[in-house]
Swiss-Prot record:
It comes from Ocimum basilicum. Keywords: Lignin biosynthesis, Metal-binding, Methyltransferase, S-adenosyl-L-methionine, Transferase. This is Cation-dependent phenylpropanoid and flavonoid 8-O-methyltransferase 1. It catalyses: an 8-hydroxyflavone + S-adenosyl-L-methionine = an 8-methoxyflavone + S-adenosyl-L-homocysteine + H(+); 4',7,8-trihydroxyflavone + S-adenosyl-L-methionine = 4',7-dihydroxy-8-methoxyflavone + S-adenosyl-L-homocysteine + H(+); 3',4',7,8-tetrahydroxyflavone + S-adenosyl-L-methionine = 3',4,7-trihydroxy-8-methoxyflavone + S-adenosyl-L-homocysteine + H(+); 3',4',7-trihydroxyflavone + S-adenosyl-L-methionine = 4',7-dihydroxy-3'-methoxyflavone + S-adenosyl-L-homocysteine + H(+). A divalent metal cation binds at D152, D178, N179. Gene3D superfamilies: Vaccinia Virus protein VP39. One of its GO terms (molecular function) is metal ion binding. Its EC number is 2.1.1.-. The gene is PFOMT-1. Belongs to the class I-like SAM-binding methyltransferase superfamily. Cation-dependent O-methyltransferase family.
Length: 234
């Protein structure tokens, strides 16, 4: 991801130059102006690294269009970059249920979302994800009704989210989990990982093993952004 000062985080690629080539050639020229604006605004936030990588967003938009997604769910919103790109990709009468524990960060990007004319598609829920998902499941009409889910929240709970998401997702629906390679630390011995990254590194390893063994979904783990795992519910 490119910082507000022009610096480049190469992500999982071997060279900054190659990552910049991908961004400059294929990602930034296709990125809508409202997304550029929100990405730049996000980089002024102290926790900007929590934002969705633009190349991840581009791939998600492609998936959304490919499956003709209309009803989607987002777990973890932050400033709303992925939320905005989803709203732009789904039809005018499409709906997104967006869950985040912090409304303040969502409101950072809200003026840009409103300016883009897509706020009417969003139902924002300020809550921890697990109780919000359990509440959704109490309504039988929500079960197997979502076309697409994006998960970018507390990594320790990914397996717990997954069980609930599978109840909400229609057969053939797609769920994308972000940060499943955690800066490449999943391939490192634990004693070589910085203490600040170890908890989520361990959580990612555990989730990766869990999802690899889940016969209910087809999966593909990709070195896009900080690593994403794409699952299709059978």
């Amino acid at each position: 991801m490119e910082g507000k000062d022009g610096s480049i985080d190469k992500g999982l690629l071997q060279s900054t130059e190659l990552y910049k080539y991908i961004l400059d050639t294929s990602v930034y020229p296709r990125e809508e102006e409202c997304l550029k604006e929100l990405r730049a605004l996000t980089w002024t936030h102290p926790r900007a690294v929590m934002g969705t990588a633009p190349e991840t967003g581009q791939f998600m938009a492609l998936l959304l269009k490919t499956i003709n997604a209309k009803k989607t769910l987002e777990i973890g919103v932050f400033t709303g970059y992925s939320l905005l790109l989803t709203a732009l990709a789904i039809p005018h009468d499409g709906k997104i249920t967006a869950i985040d524990i912090n409304r303040d960060t969502y409101e950072i990007g809200l003026p840009i979302i409103e300016k883009a004319g897509v706020k009417h598609k969003i139902d924002f829920i300020e809550s921890k994800a697990l109780p919000a998902l359990d509440h959704l499941l109490k309504d039988g009409e929500n079960k197997e009704s979502f076309d697409f889910v994006f998960v970018d929240a507390d990594k320790v709970n990914y397996a717990n989210y997954h069980e609930r998401v599978l109840e909400l997702l229609r057969p053939g629906g797609i769920v994308v989990y972000d940060n499943t390679l955690w800066g490449g630390t999943v391939a490192m011995a634990p004693d070589l990982v910085a203490e600040s990254k170890l908890q989520y590194r361990n959580a990612a390893v555990e989730f990766n093993n869990f999802i690899a063994a889940d016969s209910r979904v087809q999966i593909s783990q990709l070195p896009v952004g900080d690593g994403i795992t794409v699952c299709r519910r059978k």
